[in-house]
């Protein structure tokens, strides 16, 4: 179920403060965050945000096509290594 249009998109307050601070300075820094549930808003465009995937922070450059999506969508948490091979020699 999608979020109601009457409500504003969720963005963590600490993340929003950091982005507004960088926008006033006009500097580009990598912002580290654990807030995967935050929605990408237009003020984030052009910034690089390092999103935590449970083990490390993955840097993601925010572009205009990402607006409206959640930060966690761009930081995969599971690394699928494939199914086990069917090795007939090990069965003998």
From Swiss-Prot:
InterPro entries: Ribosomal_uS19, Ribosomal_uS19_bac-type, Ribosomal_uS19_CS, Ribosomal_uS19_SF. Gene3D superfamilies: 30s Ribosomal Protein S19, Chain A. It holds the Pfam family Ribosomal_S19. One of its GO terms (biological process) is ribosomal small subunit assembly. Coiled coil: none annotated. GO terms for cellular component: chloroplast; mitochondrial small ribosomal subunit. Keywords: Chloroplast, Plastid, Ribonucleoprotein, Ribosomal protein, RNA-binding, rRNA-binding. The keyword Heme does not apply. Its main location: plastid. Protein S19 forms a complex with S13 that binds strongly to the 16S ribosomal RNA. Belongs to the universal ribosomal protein uS19 family. NCBIfam families: rpsS_bact. This is Small ribosomal subunit protein uS19c.
């Amino acid at each position: 179920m999608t979020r109601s249009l009457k409500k504003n998109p969720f963005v963590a307050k600490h993340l929003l403060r950091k982005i507004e601070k960088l926008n006033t300075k006009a500097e580009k820094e990598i912002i580290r965050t654990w807030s995967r549930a935050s929605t990408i808003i237009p003020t984030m465009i052009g910034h690089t945000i390092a999103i935590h995937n449970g083990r490390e922070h993955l840097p993601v450059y925010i572009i205009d096509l990402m607006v409206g999506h959640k930060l966690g969508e761009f930081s995969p948490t599971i690394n699928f290594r494939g199914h086990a091979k069917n090795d007939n020699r090990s069965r003998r």
